[in-house]
Amino acid sequence: MEAGETWNVSLEWPPPSLDLSTITQTPSTIVGSGIPLNYAGLSLIVIPLITLLGNLLVIISVLRYRALQSAINFLILGLAVADLLVAIIVMPYAVYVYVTNGDWYLGNLMCDIYMASDVCCSTASILLLAVISFDRYRAVSLPIQYSRQSQNVKRVWTLIAVIWLVSLTLASPMVFGVNVRPPDANPYECRFYNAEFSILSSMISFVIPCFLVLFVYIRIIIALKKREKAAKMRREKNTIAHGLTMRPDTGEEQVDEEAAGRIVAGPVVNVMMAALPSMTRRMRQFERHRRAIELAGDEEWEEDELDVMDECCGGDDAGDDDDDYHADNGQGVVEASAPRTTSMLRRIINAASVGTANSTAQSVASASGMPAFFAQNISTTSPSSSSCARTTTTTSAIPKASGDLPLPMLLNEREFGNSSTPRSSLESLSENVNVITNDFVSENCTTFSRRSSYADDSQPTSSQTSSGDGRSYSIKGQKRFRNLSRNYSTKHHRKVVKVNRGNSRNNSRTASITNQSDDALIPAIIRTISRKSPRLFRRDKTDIKKHSMILANPITEPPKEYRRVSMPIHPTNSQTETETISASRDIENLPTTTISRSTTANSAELLGSPDDFEKFPALITETVLEDVLAETREGCFMQPTVSFALTVREMEGNALNNLKGCSVESSRRVSQVDPPLAIQILTRPSLPHLDLQRMDSIGTTCSSKTRADSLRSVDSKGSKKSNRNGIAVKLVKRAIKHEHSLKRKVSKAQRKEKRATKTLGVVVGVFLVCWVPFFVINILNAVCILLNKDSCQVGYDLFFYCTWIGYMNSFMNPIIYTIFNTEFRRAFKSIIFGRNSTRHHFSNKQAHV
């Protein structure tokens, strides 16, 4: 019965102890308890719900899409987890406190758990923001070191674990008895009473990370400003330097036309550097990566291009190089000193480059559409016997007037910036290379020898002077360069000249080409290439018969059988391109004769059809022999001297106009020979191979030879070799494409880093706005408690609103990512709207970034 009575009492409602008079008429009180309620506070539940959904989207996006699985995004994932826990654990209790008008009816233990959860999750979120800021600082200040660890996910997870461990360690004392309530404390109030611990936790949770975030982000802004300023200055200077190299009347269309004819050194440099045994794959990849990072911020110009432009525009008179050309011991030596530049192609061309030097040669080049732009002096000597004086012929340099050269004479690194050759390898080679080619007649008529020789800096020479006007070339009045011929030589075959024209065996003929430099590396590189790839350097035996050497006498008018003698070239096994040819001949009954011989600076048959080079600018490489006319005095028998000049000419913007003018009509055309494939490497099929014809002593006539005719002839020649060597073409294109891809990847990565930095700035700004008021009030209240001054403490309402402003930081982070980060925005759309096509497109496009 007693149990039944007790049961009946327990079921009685309302309890007898409840005073029904305390129940008011307003609906804002709890029925039967007299606790006032603020139902308007239930609207705050929207904030944790949106925070929950937003951070869930961030977490799913990073875990689902491989493109977002980078180090920085995994840190953002950890931040989203912390904000998610804030929305699940902390915000609902804050809504409850607001609905109950600040009263806590859930007991002291739940109050301690609520405060510990608040401290732990908020501390983790703030520390993760600090780590993300430091990560952005490393990405901006140390990009190479950062790139090596950018995908180190293990390191990121370790940092996240450490941050959560610190946060739990900081919050756990609040649960294990640190929050001791005083005897007179309000039992319905949930607050932290330990002032010392409150100050310490605020310093660790907010103050130190806040100063770190501010310091790091200020440094990031300074670094970005410096980088943008430096890039802007480089672009301005390069634009000015580029403008100085062009004529004032150069129009936009002509600039495009000239740009299409610029020289590209990428293919040659790629092929040559591929043969160097010292360049390993790891070194090449590292150097390409380093250079691409350096160039990514500057899309149009390179820093080193300024040096090239300065050399191109530094002086307008090239006639001051008077001491560059010498002659000694009856050996005509032509020495050329080209301006120094970091261009690899510049050094290769300088190894065999001497410009034409008289007005007739200029007219021929102009008629052919190929102006001479290497200004150099050419000296020719004829050694005298004991009773004869030495006769010396000296030519002056061609002035580098801007009106004479529509395009820059020198090359710049922009033209082959897409080359995969490392920058260090370019600088490792010497600026100039000495090459000497000696052709002489030995005393033994049956002996033929061939050797390769290089110029020595210590070689004794005698200085020759130039007149400086670029047109004077006279011995006893008037001399002219003649017998210009373009005759391509065979590839890596010996060239033997058998000459039997007389009975004299005591006369020798010498011709030399020297390019002033510190060493001679280019011929060695060429030989290395030929040894590494012998099959690419061979030529069909049927092509050997097409080659010939031409002998002519420009001074007198001997019979036709003596004026032009075509002599076959007998091939032998040789891999050198710069050689010495020895032959014996009799010239007793013949007048002074000038020998014409052409050779190429690079005879490697490396690339295939010119049709594969539609994207390459044109490089017209002409091997021109300039015969220096030597006079003989009465009573003196002098040995004639032949001077060779190998010239690299560039098809300029006004080539079409020159071709429409007068062209020299020769009495004999050079035999039709396919050009060496090494020249085809640098030749674009859309631009013609211009034939330099021999000049006859009898007058010249004007003919209308247009560019289209030359183009058709080149295309017809190129079609014959369309099926030859396409492998090297593909390799070169692949290398250039890889370099383009590398630069695009680096540039794209830096753009993404910039967007991430911008997003970080917004996140940091929101973080400061949200959390600074709360922690200022929290520290101020703790100080007031230590000083026992209740008057300085902040009231409940202000403290509550500042706390909710701090919670809004977790609410704002996903919104910031959606607005300022295109990758997250695309991922959010794919998740919300279920766009599978968008997801697949996003994954495929960003998979390897």
From Swiss-Prot:
How this chain sits in the membrane, per its record, is:
Multi-pass membrane protein
- InterPro entries associated with the record: GPCR_Rhodpsn (IPR000276), GPCR_Rhodpsn_7TM (IPR017452)
**Feature: compositional bias, Polar residues:** 501-515
Question: Disulfide connectivity?
Answer: C111-C190
Q: Region Disordered: start and end of each range?
A: 450-515
The biased composition feature labelled Low complexity covers 457-470
Entry's transmembrane regions: 40-60, 71-91, 113-133, 156-176, 204-224, 760-780, 799-819
Extracellular face of the membrane: 1-39, 92-112, 177-203, 781-798
Write down the glycosylated positions: N8
| Predominant cellular place of this UniProt entry's protein | membrane
Keyword Transcription carried by entry: no
Question: What does the subunit comment say?
Answer: Interacts (via C-terminus) with the G-alpha protein gpa-14; the interaction is direct.
Beyond the main fields, what else does the record say?
Modulates drug-mediated behavior, such as the response to nicotine and amphetamine. Plays a role in the sensitivity to the drug nicotine and promotes movement towards nicotine sources. Plays a role in promoting amphetamine-induced loss of motility in water, termed swimming-induced paralysis.
- Task of the protein: G-protein coupled receptor which binds to the neurotransmitter dopamine with high affinity leading to the activation of an associated G-protein and downstream signaling pathways. Couples to G-proteins to inhibit adenylate cyclase (AC) activity and cAMP production. Inhibits synaptic vesicle fusion to negatively regulate the release of dopamine at dopaminergic neuron synapses. Antagonizes octopamine signaling in response to food by promoting the dopamine-mediated suppression of crh-1/CREB1 transcription factor activation in cholinergic SIA neurons.
The entry's protein name is Dopamine receptor 2
Q: Which organism is it from?
A: Caenorhabditis elegans
